[in-house]
Amino acid sequence: MKFLFFLLLTLSLPAASKPNFVIIFTDDQGYGDLGCFGSETIKTPNIDRLAREGRRFTSFMVASPVCSPSRAALLTGCYPKRVGMHQHVLFPHSTKGLNPTEHSIADHLSDQGYATACFGKWHLGHHPETLPQK
């Protein structure tokens, strides 16, 4: 959360050029599951290269031990309870989802001229009004 706050705080600072960056958010991954953190069992050459050539943040903590609440926290910069995503993982039959009026990191980055995208598992609502296309 500290990093996300710092990132959003620094978005308004002038810069010669804006850096490109990728946030990789995975479920059920342990610290030692990547080669760049010492795994010899699981081969992760592309992520290892990103870690070697870019910046690695090693002290990030998640706001929840399960995917939907921790995903909501990363995307909004808020505690899961604040955005109503604190109770459980959202499954396809769930009627709740991330409120589309919440401002996400993508919204803030878009305001600063960044092109943003989200690939893979959304898991923050399965109904049209809670999907990221909104």
Report the location of each language-model feature.
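Formylglycine-dependent sulfatase
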Residues: 2, 15-134
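Hydrophobic h-region of N-terminal signal peptides that target proteins for export
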Residues: 6-16
